[in-house]
Amino acid sequence: MKQFLKKFLFFSFIVIALLIVAFIIIQYDAEGEKSLPFSLTKILLVSTVNGDITDDPENIWNIDITQVNDVYMYIDKTEETEETIKEIKLENFLVNKAPEKGNIKLLRPTGELSNLYTYSEQDYLNSEITYQGGIIDDMKSLEIANNGGILGFRFSLNDLGKYISNENEEIIYDGNLLKNLGVTLEQIQFSVSFDIVITTSDDISYKGNVNIDMPIDSIIEEGSSHKEITDFSNVIFKRI
């Protein structure tokens, strides 16, 4: 009887221990890290309309129209720590919902603040963008302040069509250009998800998945719109 009781208690202990471990794993999978040295606190999304002028001897205006979405991610230190940001990697970009018109490109900053993307041509949609920790934010050099800062990138929707006109008018790059092409909001809406990996100076990495719907709904009417996203309850960071 005593031997049976010992075996029963032993196996009961094993079962309880396994249940506790399983509960911890499930809870971590659902909630992620409770205490992060750095976290994503805000995303600023700016949706606008751009155009590239084509030389055309027959028309005053011949403009290739592009809808662009600038993304600025704010990374803040969340606790008293001596850790700093070593690097932040944006990877595994996935188009969850493709637009009906246009082709998506992902661009990195290559210029100063006044012309961040003027010379940006390489498409990073099937690649990754890595910001190194530095003294200050420098998007052109892909550097983010190592105590927290802002990083940026752009999703552009190219090949929407050409605006051709012989009116001697000033061109305003806003939603009217999309209207003139007969482009509707529903035709250019798309959704992209990607992983953000924050690596600290202690070589500890935390990964979360972010999803962004673009462009902002008011782009057709307002032409240039911005939106702040601060609810990240669905972005779960885990150690990797």
Where are these regions (language model features)?
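Non-catalytic macromolecular-recognition regions in eukaryotic signaling proteins
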Residues: I25-Q187, S201-I240
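Hydrophobic, Leu/Ile/Phe/Ala-enriched alpha-helical segments that form helix-helix packing faces
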Residues: M1, I198-T200
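Hydrophobic alpha-helical membrane-insertion segments, chiefly the h-region
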Residues: I16-Q27
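Short, structured surface segments that line ligand/substrate-binding pockets
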Residues: F190-I198
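N-terminal Sec-pathway targeting helices
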Residues: M1-A17
